[in-house]
Amino acid sequence: MAQRTLVATFFLIFFLLTNLVCSKEIIVGGKTSSWKIPSSPSESLNKWAESLRFRVGDTLVWKYDEEKDSVLQVTKDAYINCNTTNPAANYSNGDTKVKLERSGPYFFISGSKSNCVEGEKLHIVVMSSRGGHTGGFFTGSSPSPAPSPALLGAPTVAPASGGSASSLTRQVGVLGFVGLLAIVLL
């Protein structure tokens, strides 16, 4: 009986640690100097974002000169119009980290309206969370009411097919293997 309790405890700890390891920090644009006005449409941060899969639990990281710029999280309408007056969140420390707490679209613009107008902005879509729970709006607190449709701005996009296996699939596979190993050893 004690061995089964030990195995169950091991599974629980392993599953929780695997969940933590699967989240990652992503530097916006792929390098520290990317939060700037793009020199051409092909260097748009949205082009960069289209090549990635963002997941609930990932963290976006911006590096920039806090004396010259900032990052605003805004609604879809504010994103389209580069409206900097009423952001949902304002980051200005030069080393901004935003944890993606829910699935769906996120919109970010430069705190400088002129920079935004010239293309310094980012729109990403976060894939559904591993297990279906989307968490709170900006924090990982207990479930809260659904975010305002105006802030979401668009429907959630389904994950593209043919990509790498999802984190949940990897976790189930690893847990299955460890479970089989535990049964064989007992």
Swiss-Prot record:
Compartment(s): Cell membrane
Residues of the signal peptide: 1-23
UniProt GO molecular function: electron transfer activity
Main location: membrane
Keyword Cell membrane listed: yes
Superkingdom of the source species: Eukaryota
Domain Phytocyanin: 24-128
Any one cellular-component term (Gene Ontology): plasmodesma
Pfam families cross-referenced by the UniProt entry: Cu_bind_like (PF02298)
Name of the molecule in the record: Early nodulin-like protein 13
Organism of this sequence: Arabidopsis thaliana
